[in-house]
């Protein structure tokens, strides 16, 4: 009888450890989107950048982790066409902005996650752009095989100071605001 109880206890422990095993869901980079908007005194520009790879980690259907790599060489303005699009794309990839020849990728690594309920989580992560890492906090929603989030990033924290009134005086209508926005839709 004692052996039967020991076996039953071992079985229960084994089952309980199975239920808390982490499940890593690889993001389908080809179906996921990252849209950006950068604003200036006289208007704004918008575009896309491609996700290179990424994964979300779940335990008991709750988000517990995530890592992402963005291909900065794909940075593209979509609000312009022709020559003007080419000029803006080139400038955004130059050292004044993202320096994509030297820094072809950016990364995001989740550090802490708190559930807000209804598949919404508050995430604090380390964001690395141009070799500089800073914490960022945002909400992410997960539903089925989809996750969405919006991030506001202060580019000056990553040594992207071009056109920033925080660093240069007398820019007038040439001022570019420090924050840019990302709208992210992940498919996995």
Where do the protein language model's features map onto the residues?
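Low-complexity, acidic/polar, glycine-enriched regions of mature
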Residues: 21-188
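Bacterial Sec-dependent N-terminal signal peptides
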Residues: 1-25
